[in-house]
Swiss-Prot record:
Motif 'HIGH' region, residue numbers: 42-51
PANTHER family named in the record: TYROSINE--TRNA LIGASE, TYROSYL-TRNA SYNTHETASE
Location in or out of the cell: Cytoplasm
Function (record text): Catalyzes the attachment of tyrosine to tRNA(Tyr) in a two-step reaction: tyrosine is first activated by ATP to form Tyr-AMP and then transferred to the acceptor end of tRNA(Tyr).
HAMAP family hit by this protein: Tyr_tRNA_synth_type2 (MF_02007)
SMART domains assigned: S4 (SM00363)
Assigned keywords, A-Z: Aminoacyl-tRNA synthetase, ATP-binding, Cytoplasm, Ligase, Nucleotide-binding, Protein biosynthesis, RNA-binding
EC number: 6.1.1.1
Residue ranges constituting the S4 RNA-binding domain according to the UniProt record: 341-397
Phylogenetic placement of the source organism: Bacteria, Pseudomonadati, Thermodesulfobacteriota, Desulfovibrionia, Desulfovibrionales
Coiled coil feature spans: none
Organism: Nitratidesulfovibrio vulgaris (strain ATCC 29579 / DSM 644 / CCUG 34227 / NCIMB 8303 / VKM B-1760 / Hildenborough)
Protein name as annotated: Tyrosine--tRNA ligase
Sequence similarity: Belongs to the class-I aminoacyl-tRNA synthetase family. TyrS type 2 subfamily.
Subunit-level organization: Homodimer.
Amino acid sequence: MIDIDRQLEHIKRGCAELIDEGELRKKLERGTPLRIKAGFDPTAPDLHLGHTVLIHKLRHFQELGHTVIFLIGDFTGLIGDPSGRSDTRPPLTREQVLANAETYKQQVFKILDPEKTVVDFNSRWMGEFGAADFIRLASRYTVARMMERDDFEKRYKEGRPIAVHEFLYPLVQGYDSVALKADVELGGTDQKFNLLVGRHLQSQYGQEPQCILTMPLLEGLDGVKKMSKSLGNYVGIDESPADMFGKLMSVSDELMWRYFELISSRSLDEIADLRRKVETGEAHPKLVKESLAYELTTRYHGEDKAAEAQQGFNAVFAGGGVPDDAPVHACDHGDDSTPPAFLEAAGLVKSRGEAKRLIKEGALSVDGVRCDDANSPLASGEYVIKLGKKRFLRLTVR
């Protein structure tokens, strides 16, 4: 096993919070592989780069010789995670959950080593729970403690409904740690409450409490909200190489450092050196961003496809095929940087209604990537906009 201080340095890279470092050190000092758990509810059919923040951290643990458990919450997916919700999440059908879970299994091994990964389903133990078992589990936690959770407290004060089954979600997730005898559980910062419930339940069931490692939520392409398919600001790991490369090139110069730290394989020293070179003018931020887009596209599609995507992107962005007299337009990030707004302001369309119609028909591309979202603003940066076959625009979003 690697030296404990080096392990801790590797483990803490990019993490938001570790509870408790002293406890984790003691676990590592035993010299036996730890059981590292991270759960994923298959509520959508595809993984995106936001999900991979946790998966990469699991990979770090694999590289350190520990046992990784990729837990698919096929049972909890039927309940619906209330974390960060202002309303009750509609439950999925069993068929939807199983179909999504199968896709997850196929996608996750683009990052994890399948030989060092245990894939499990929490229906394996929760499916056998009866009414009496649930009542006994519910007795291990209080309503007062449950109401300390920010989203529940807020909804209660605002008079919005909280369904009883939503109280079960953190209990079931917590019991997963009991069933798996987890030493460490990973989750996003929005999962901290649920992870702490797991620690509590392990103590209640006579187990040594798991350590908790929370990871930041990766901002989406807009640089504001967390990456989410429902918000349209995501990069799916199964997207075409051209779309993946183009979307990554659209992130702001500042946001790219966040992506480097959380989802690239570069060392922290390498990232710091790249940042220094950009700040001193030794390297152009576009070229550094291009190296990030190339690295990630290579990971999910291979080097040949990444090279093709890079060439295709540069053919558009560097001016190939873009008329010298293409109009130039600048706008502020926000409402003015939504496609209908900047297309109308730049004179490429007569009205926002016309812009929305053309977008719906698939006529708009941003940096060579088709754009079907008429509502989300583009992040700060420079773009080549193409509308139809002949209309171009060089756009700067401040």
